[in-house]
């Protein structure tokens, strides 16, 4: 939501059901689709998440991203640009046991132009937003000094992606020091 409360950003996909696959009630007409489904439906451009902008009154719906990449978690920056995460960088997460796409920080103008990658990190980054000083705050799956199953920790970076750093320092918490806090 913009600071003036007039415009919303969101990510949307058709969830693998094209118009030809839906019944009149909007439910999938293919009996293999649903809870019993053992495989992902085949990829199509319509099944990728894309970023949209719309006025709170429902007018002016505009798709801002396109292509074969998933674009998620859009949020406004104080300068009017949009920060989001995307698979556009390419690459795969390091230790998932199988190829899992990598999501990193990106930004673009409010009209979807001038898209830039903000991060070169080799792990997933999630939920970007802006703090009161205009810095981008996000969570990052980071393996430095902690196991693979630790919680994602908060990070901060400049709006142009410079100087990314952990907010609280990069340390592995000791469960002995705080037994009530379980991070696994």
Where are these regions (language model features)?
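Hydrophobic, small-residue-rich alpha-helical packing segments that form membrane-like cores
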Residues: 79, 87-90, 105-110, 115, ...
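Blade-loop segments of beta-propeller domains
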Residues: 1-12, 29-33, 60-70
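WD40 beta-propeller repeat blades
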Residues: 132-133, 140-141, 148-151, 156-183
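Conserved beta-propeller blade repeats
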Residues: 1-4, 70-82, 122-137, 171-184
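Multi-bladed beta-propeller domains
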Residues: 56-70, 109-123, 158-177
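Short, conserved, GDST-rich strand-edge loop motifs in beta-rich repeat architectures
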Residues: 11-47, 84-101, 138-152
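Beta-propeller blade signature
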Residues: 30, 41-58, 99-112, 151-162
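Residue position within the beta-strands of beta-propeller blades
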Residues: 7-16, 53, 63, 81-87, ...
